Amino acid sequence: MAFLWLFSLWLLVPGTQGTKDGDMRLVNGASANEGRVEIFYRGQWGTVCDNLWNILDANVVCRALGYENATQALGRAAFGPGRGPVMLDEVECTGTEPSLANCSSLGWLKSRCGHEKDAGVVCSNETGGVHILDLSGDLPNALGQIFDSQQGCDLFIQVTGQGHGDLTICAHKLILNTNPEAQALWQVVGSSVIMRVDAECMPVVRDFLRYFYSRRIEVTMSSVKCLHKLASAYGATQLQDYCGRLFATLLPQDPTFRTPLELYAYAQATRDSVLEDLCVQFLAWNFEPLTQAEAWLSVPTALLQALLSKSDLAVSSELDLLKAVDQWSMESSASHAEVERLLEQVRFPMVLPQELFELQFNLSLYEGHRELFQRKTMEALEFHTVPFRVLAKYRGLNLTEDTYQPRLYTSSTWSTLVTESSSRSRAAVQVYGYAQYYPYGYDSRRWYYPYQSFQTPQHPSFLFVDKLISWSATYLPTVQSCWNYGFSCTPEELPVLGLTKSSYSEPAIGYENKALMLCGGYSVVDVANFAGSKAPIPSALDTNSSKISSLFPCSSGAFSGFRVVIRPFYLTNSTDLD
């Protein structure tokens, strides 16, 4: 017990937690006060690129490690190249920050540097009389081993899984008493306590209790829901908040869509409106791959109703959406009235006349809902064949209603994909007023940037089916690239997507265009508006930079591409409607 008591006292000493994001160390130096700078982030150590590296940045490192100042700020891997990721680049400190993580930079994992540019420092030998022996990094593992031993306990936890077998785990009140998150357990009077958990959460109970000892836990797609549930039930607020933030990270990682659907059901059961909205948003942006997954047929009716009501639902076309609903209905237990309500959400005016005619032959839903289909088809045909001014005058249609507005249609009719390979093989450069062409790769840092030229109809109405408008979409990572393509940009807003149209469009038609951020080639993790001719590109990961992060982090650290979607609509207040 003396050993346990000493460990518990150690836990109470300030600064005895394990390594955390932003911690720094010096590696490969000839003495303790010099070396390659490494910084900790998300469970691993990485290096810092020497771009903009100077003595102010080095001072931050040295002072954080107990030295008075830095004497040298070195680059070009002066202490040898490191291994692992390059965590930070273009670091700019004032010299007073507690860590490089608090300085201005490109953000975590945004560098394109190689390890030949790893930054290093030499710190002064003066430590102001302070000498630190810090072995606290070993403490979490040692306390975890005490839990694993299941010996010397004074608290016995009976875990019941609601008819699926019980589990008895012993714990140590003295250790639990040092952790405010374990208050629900250490405040128990007596030597035993009962934990009632769902049967599906039994496998993670031991990890949950061990977390109170080591203050470290691995959270996966399969465990996040149960850990969030246990943390909520037992007041482990830090773990609860962490899991809550992690939901957004985990949603894009499951191509089967089982995790988003399970989390949606969990959010409804616990009345967690924030998590519910998060799941609905992710599934709306990724509606197309959802309809192609096996999980599509198990989507709840209420969730499908919520999805179909959204304008920011991404799908190839409204016809493909209707076909997916038709397929879903064949396996669903939804009532006739529930299916009718779903069909009311379909935007029939966004389906072309020929496709509307063919619905009666191609949809299993048609016969059971013939009256609705005929009514919706007639309304859609009026939209396609009658000029806007006549519709507004004689029908009194409110063309601002959702049914007359396009969603995020990702087919080639209404969108284009911009990736690193989506440009022409040659780049044009203006030299003395003449266009000269260079092969792919010419001075790529200055002149070559991904772009796409494409055409779309001016409007979804069949009246405009042959009236095309030309667009150019460009990825703009630098101020120079903005100048090259005729845009005005500030360094703070970069990178951005640029979008221009190069042909005439009807004055009665406006555009609310969108940019979809793609991760891993298939998941949409964020959507940005084109304000004028530019759409901001968020950070792919949640970083310490001032730039906004994507709603759903992209685990690779970079977007795989961008889909530009054109969304025309009638300007109902236009004075020129002919």
UniProtKB/Swiss-Prot annotation:
One GO cellular component term of this record is: extracellular space
Provide this UniProt record's keywords sorted from A to Z. Answer: Cell adhesion, Disulfide bond, Extracellular matrix, Glycoprotein, Secreted, Signal
Q: Which SUPFAM superfamilies match?
A: POZ domain, SRCR-like
UniProt signal peptide: 1-18
Q: Does the keyword Acetylation apply?
A: no
Among Gene3D superfamilies, the record links this protein to: 1.25.40.420, Potassium Channel Kv1.1, Chain A, SRCR-like domain
Where in the cell is the protein located?
A: Secreted; Secreted, Extracellular space, Extracellular matrix
Start and end of every BACK domain? Answer: 260-360
Give every SRCR domain span.
24-124
Write out the GO biological process terms.
cell adhesion
Q: Which residues are glycosylated?
A: N69, N102, N362, N398
Under InterPro entries, the record lists: BACK (IPR011705), BTB-POZ/Galectin-3-binding (IPR051481), BTB/POZ_dom (IPR000210), SKP1/BTB/POZ_sf (IPR011333), SRCR (IPR001190), SRCR-like_dom_sf (IPR036772)
Instruction: Give every BTB domain span.
Output: 153-221
Name the PROSITE patterns for this protein: BTB, SRCR_1, SRCR_2
Function (record text): Promotes integrin-mediated cell adhesion. May stimulate host defense against viruses and tumor cells.
State how it assembles: Homodimers and homomultimers. The multimers form ring-like structures with a diameter of 30-40 nm. Binds LGALS1 and LGALS3. Binds ITGB1, COL4A1, COL5A1, COL6A1, FN1 and NID. The unglycosylated form interacts with PDE4DIP; this interaction, which is PDE4DIP isoform-specific, may connect a pericentrosomal complex to the gamma-tubulin ring complex (gamma-TuRC) to promote microtubule assembly and acetylation.
For this entry, the protein name equals: Galectin-3-binding protein
> Source species, please?
Mesocricetus auratus
Upper classification of the organism: Eukaryota, Metazoa, Chordata, Craniata, Vertebrata
